Amino acid sequence: WFDAMQLEEGLTLNHFNMVQNSDFSVTGTDGKPKAWTVGKNDASYVEVLPLDAPKDEFHAPDCLKHDNTQKIRLAGRYDRTVTYYQQFRHYGKIGDRFTVGGWCSSFAKKNDPDNYIYCRITVQFTSADPVTDKSYWATGGSAVFNAEEGNWQFASAGIVAPNNCTYIRVVLQMNRQMNFADFTGIYLYPEAFGTQYVYDKNGNRKTRKMLYGGQEKSEFDGADNLTKHTAA
């Protein structure tokens, strides 16, 4: 099978969203969004709702309003994580780069990674068979949303595959949270995110690698004075 074939002139290609049914508009006969899965034992805390209802206190931006667009609401629980995810086959290598992002309207607490409190979109990778309980999912990064009082916000982040993989999982997560969070417009692009910087132990920028291959290098003396700079 072949999909998303493109022929373009230029240095860059257009975005291709690896996430299917990213706005939850396509549903099955059971009314549930296709291609998405409720986390284990999380059914009581996940709802599918219209994107914008007259009674909503905070309305979604116009750019999200398409035919049948819906949102996923995850209820916060103080003692557990609540997830909603999509997984798909992808053969990749360690170090592969992606960009993940989406929209969220939350009444969540401030994120606290040390105590595992967060509201986010996480991308995970496995080289095992995800049908079995033995598959280990390694995290490649997350797009984290700020604590808010309902306003819609957009978040995006760079993702790096931590290992070779045969499957990718994009996960909406509410962990040890309060109230609820609504998600929609989820995407995962198979490309690097922005510009990569490398610094030495003194904070001097040694290299800058651009998204499309260009790279700059800098050298410093013992007093942190720039002695050489090259660009390619």
Where are these regions (language model features)?
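Extracellular and organelle-lumenal recognition/adhesion modules and their flexible linkers in secreted
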Residues: W1-D200
